[in-house]
Amino acid sequence: MDEQAKQLVSEVVRPLPPEPGHPLRIDYEYVREGQCTVWMFVEPLAGWRSVRTSDRRTGVDWAHQVQQLVNDRRYAGAERITLVCDNLNTHQLGSLYQAFEPAEALRLARRIELVHPPKHGSWLNAAEPELSALTRQCLGQRIATRKEVGQLARIWKNCRNRRRVHIDWQFTTDNARIKLRHLYPKMLD
């Protein structure tokens, strides 16, 4: 899972539609309308992702996103759900206890296993390339409201899930030993 902030921006002057020989013309002036957070959960090999939005990006917001994931019928039969998360201070089991009553927090904590990539290893989180694709294909334009961001992200997600676009992770242990050799300890003879 991963999340990113999305700046909300509205137009001051309505863009001029494209005409033959002229692309869409957008005025450089805009109005900041705040920001929202886009949350991405990915199951890479299954070609499934979930995208949601919230107003903020706090530990309590993260806990509510995790609760929705755990309560999803997709994971009803799963004993444990492994979540690869960034090393943010909000991505901790303690956030569940800030957001919920102890019994609910314990129920959620027992269902998830948090895995944090090594420092400077966020590229190991499969949700990052999905967020990048979402931004490039869908959210890289001026969007004024969180509702619009949610609608566009939902359409994108449904299309990707319907096509079962999976992440073909081809980084083997042998490749890691070559490409990441600078991270391995040096043995003296």
Label every model-predicted segment.
Residues 9-11, 92-97:
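A short acidic (Asp/Glu
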